[in-house]
Amino acid sequence: MGIKVSSKIKRILASTGYIPIFIFKYRYYFYFFYCKFARKFVTKKIIILKLSSIGTASGSSNPKDGADVDVREEYANAFRTESYNHFWTRVVQLSRKKSAVSSSSSSPPIESSSTSARLMSYRLFAHNLLDPDLNTITRILDVSRVGRHTRTLLSDYFLETANAFLLCTQLLKNIHHLRSKYESLKPKFHSENHNSLALIDQFTEISKWFDPFISSGSRIQLIRSGCLYLLKRLESRRDKTRAKLKLINGLTHSSGLLVLALTTTLIVTIASHAFALFLAAPTLLASQFKPAGLRNKLTKTAARLDVAAKGTYILSRDLDTISRLVTRINDEVNHVRAMAEFWVGRGSGRVRGSEEVARELKRCEESFSEELDELEEHIYLCFMTINRARNLLVKEILDSDDPPNCSFAPKSKKKL
């Protein structure tokens, strides 16, 4: 399939000048064969690269190493970036317990695949890590040249992020208490010689520790709804500011044509002795259509509102994810607690009930621990996101042609 052209025919066509016509006439055939050849070449190249990578991996490692790859560890390593290490350093510095600081500094780098082993440190510090704090934010907004409406919106943004930060801190405390109580109960379920009646009573009592954790779901939704309302206000104000800026830019560009037309008309209609005045008219009139100060102010305001809107949107998505994780844990806890309450109500079947509850706890033990670790790690990443967004907005507020001379301005840091 295809068209073969001999060298003799090519020479004849070349002598007559028909090669361009021939190529144009059969251009689709040339394109078809070119694509077919390119696809075969790329496929062959990919196969060769895969075979070479497999050969290299098999030659440098044992066959058992492929089966021992820990996906959770690889996922965790993806988050150990420069911002992760920077935040971890701040965790150690802000810890009030010197023993914890010394032990964390003397311990080797974190290599465990368990998420709980990596996240033991920040349970002591969360309320100290909000950056910048509310007092600093208040002073920055007071000395900055921000409009009244914009200042109100930015102040509400910092307040909402602070509330979300405090909520995440409370969630961490609840997770810590929940894990400690669960760990104290777990060996008794694994023991073969346990008191079945006391076991169910103890689990029923410990299940009350889940109530503050369960009630936090409504608070998450409340803060998230506040973030969504604030996001609408920020976007509305930003769009209005951009519309004003676009209008001013349009007037600025059209003022040149307007002045030129007006000057030409005046030159034609007025006597020549006023010609010098007409030459100065474009400069005088153009100055009325170039509000450079207002344009710069609107540009900075739009940029600040845009940064705040992006930070609010990301925070709302993080809170939505945290809410889903909390709901998933609540469903599993309610399932086990309902089973325990069912066997408690049976009375005579409490011995069998303890066995059923113990069996159910063994079944969901691993998934329950992983869910707590996943929630804890996402809260930790939410801390970093909140601080990064707040610092970006503060930098945008202080970044101007004549920045205020304030000693509390954030120092230059590495970009998170």
From Swiss-Prot:
<keyword id="KW-0812">Transmembrane</keyword>
<keyword id="KW-1133">Transmembrane helix</keyword>
<feature type="transmembrane region" description="Helical">
    <location>
        <begin position="266"/>
        <end position="286"/>
    </location>
</feature>
<comment type="similarity">
    <text>Belongs to the UPF0496 family.</text>
</comment>
<dbReference type="InterPro" id="IPR007749">
    <property type="entry name" value="DUF677"/>
</dbReference>
<dbReference type="Pfam" id="PF05055">
    <property type="entry name" value="DUF677"/>
</dbReference>
<dbReference type="GO" id="GO:0016020">
    <property type="term" value="C:membrane"/>
</dbReference>
<protein>
    <recommendedName>
        <fullName>UPF0496 protein At3g49070</fullName>
    </recommendedName>
</protein>
<keyword id="KW-0472">Membrane</keyword>
